[in-house]
């Protein structure tokens, strides 16, 4: 094994140990975010305190709001999602996926993540709007990424969302979301 390979192995081990350490620090955590109203424009979203994008939990909560906006108005929702994705905007495949998920009147899907939203009440959330974001022991396994979970009123288990931290300023951006999968029909 060359000197370069040994140094590379040490660096990789150090990075993995650091990621595990962050994961152990994060552990199982729950954060609930409360919104008096849903933003109807990117400017309104950016005016929210969570818009600093300084925690993966805040970015995950804003993603739910952006998906609600997308259900109401695709252009506004796309603008919000692109902002949350940072330097990696939605591509044609992403937009096609979103459009497919909201087809056939399934605009209720993102509302299933708010407290009080159940199939019995047609996924009408309680107000103010509250969304809870959770982490667990595997959330920080991958360095620079955080996999969080959002409880859903229409499913038995929380749904995952993956966020990426930008190294230059520490901001958290949406990387992948699995929030628009099937739920119990209202």
Residue ranges and their predicted role:
Residues 4-12, 72, 127, 139:
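Large, modular interaction/toxin scaffolds in secreted and membrane-associated proteins
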Residues 151-186:
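Short beta-strand edge/turn micro-motifs at domain boundaries
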